[in-house]
A protein has these predicted regions:
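Conserved small/polar residues in nucleotide/adenosyl-binding loops
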Residues: 236-237
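Residue-level recognition of short, structured coil/turn motifs
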Residues: 5, 59-60, 168
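Solvent-exposed N-terminal domain segments of exported/luminal and surface proteins
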Residues: 101-221
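Short amphipathic beta-strand and strand-loop transition segments with alternating hydrophobic
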Residues: 64-71, 224-233
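Alpha-mannosidase-like glycoside hydrolase catalytic domains involved in N-glycan trimming
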Residues: 15-136, 142-145
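Bacterial Sec-dependent N-terminal signal peptides
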Residues: 1-18
Length: 238
């Protein structure tokens, strides 16, 4: 549960403009929450300047955060972060939005990639792909669409009419997709790497938007276009 507290302030130093405000985050459960996602829509804050960076503070401790551009207009639409909350508790964090750019890096918690295979068999990284609904580049997309992972598990999303989520299970905590590319070698498997653990076929996999014809699920088709995009692409250091 989010609550924006009163007392917004705007400060300007040199050419940098800042806006600070407090956000109360509460956990009404009888159970603690780890890495609870918090999303703040910037349109509701109305900073009145172009936001290029943000800082979220829990007392004297900074919480890693990211600004997301959801519609591709090169302007952030939301601020997202995760926070640990004990059972039946509240925390108040201070958010500062700034017009200044930042080269700040945070420890990696996730990884995502989308690769297009060229004629020489090399995999070219891309952040967004849009094709007509009549086109099919399923086999030109390495691992058939975007792949993303936490330290615990990885997924891929098929870039075709199935739009199915597939799962890559892990034996050990850590990141593997950049190295294994969703297809671990025998040597990597011997080192304890995980692997694709689900035969998706024509099913919904872990979950997918499907139609229903009264008897069975159906793919959503035809469509005018297909788009897949990595919304937040940040530089991390570990």
């Amino acid at each position: 549960v989010l609550l924006l507290l009163c007392g917004l302030s705007v400060t300007a130093e040199a050419q940098e403009t800042q806006k600070s405000f407090k956000v109360e985050v509460s956990n009404t459960w009888n159970k603690a929450k780890a890495d609870e996602p918090v999303v703040i829509k910037l349109s509701e804050i109305n900073p009145q300047f172009r936001v290029r960076s943000a800082v979220v503070m829990n007392g004297s401790e900074e919480i890693p955060s990211q600004l997301d551009d959801l519609n591709g207009d090169l302007r952030p639409d939301e601020l997202a972060f995760v926070i640990d909350l004990p059972a039946k508790s509240k925390k108040t964090v201070t958010v500062t939005l700034s017009s200044a750019k930042s080269d700040k890096t945070y420890p990696a918690r996730v990884y995502a990639e989308m690769l297009v295979s060229d004629k020489r068999g090399k995999h070219v990284p891309v952040h967004s792909v849009t094709i007509p609904g009549t086109s099919n580049i399923y086999n030109q997309m390495h691992h058939h669409g975007p792949a993303f992972e936490s330290e615990l598990v990885a997924y891929r999303l098929y870039f075709d009419k199935k739009q199915t989520v597939d799962i890559y299970g892990k034996f050990n905590k850590g990141f593997e997709i950049k190295e294994s590319q969703f297809y671990p070698t025998d040597e990597q498997l011997a080192r304890g790497f995980g692997d694709d653990v689900l035969l998706v076929g024509g099913s919904c996999g872990l979950g997918a938007l499907k139609g229903w014809d009264g008897k069975k699920s159906t793919h959503i088709e035809p469509v005018s276009t297909l788009t897949e995009r990595i919304i937040a692409c940040l530089l991390y250091t570990s």
